[in-house]
From Swiss-Prot:
It is found in: Secreted. The keyword Iron does not apply. This is Apolipoprotein C-I. Residues 1-26 form the signal peptide. Belongs to the apolipoprotein C1 family. GO terms for molecular function: fatty acid binding; phospholipase inhibitor activity.
Length: 87
């Protein structure tokens, strides 16, 4: 049974070996590489901008930032009241 199953596998491997190596891809020339750089930089910049905006929005919407902002507001009002009552 194993011998019968291994024959098709052997035939496929033999066909792949006899096919030979795949043709090599042509190396891109320098001019085409240099022409693609601005597009890649623009794509990179937009990706970074999108991730940065997402991170900033996430920070703004987080509970920690809201609590911190409230704490600073309360502290400022307390200091302001103390300053007004003292002077």
């Amino acid at each position: 049974m194993r011998f019968i199953l291994s024959l098709p596998v052997l035939a496929v491997v033999l066909a792949m070996v006899l096919e030979g190596p795949a043709p090599a891809q042509a190396d891109p020339d320098i001019s085409s590489s240099l022409e693609s750089i601005p597009g890649k930089l623009k794509e990179f910049g937009s990706t970074v901008e999108e991730k940065f905006r997402t991170a900033i929005d996430q920070i703004k919407k987080s509970e920690f930032s809201e609590k911190t902002q409230n704490w600073f507001s309360e502290l400022f009002h307390k200091v302001k009241e103390k300053f007004e009552t003292t002077f």
